[in-house]
Amino acid sequence: RRQRQMCIRDSRQIMYNSKLLQTEEFNKMHSFCLDFIKQSLAESTAKHIVVVTHHLPTLEVVAPHHKGSVLNSAFATELGQLIADNRIDAWIYGHSHTNIDAEINGTKVVCNQMGYVFENEHIANGFEPGKFLVL
């Protein structure tokens, strides 16, 4: 946990209740949000369901050069079973600054992140300004 806090920029910059956001607070927020997603999925009668989160919903879309990193828990949560068990048309995510799409049990897991423009990540990571999603 300490290594994650030292290596991730967000851990040194995000304030919560007038102090740096701590892992425990983040985990509480994560649990609250995940419960909301689960409840919303269970109650939805919508024809199409799209989930949008900041973080990666599966390790399947972690960049190859980050596979196995101890820092992955700061970027992704393995929700592959949740995705497979629900009728989600698409899950749109961000945070990783790499653009990797996947499909899990018919669900499109997609992103189109610019990343840090001042570091030219939008060029290196294949940001597509005209990209769109068809359901």
What are these regions (language model features)?
Residues 52-57, 89-99:
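Histidine-centered catalytic micro-motifs
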Residues 63, 69-89, 97-135:
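Binuclear metal-dependent phosphoesterase catalytic core
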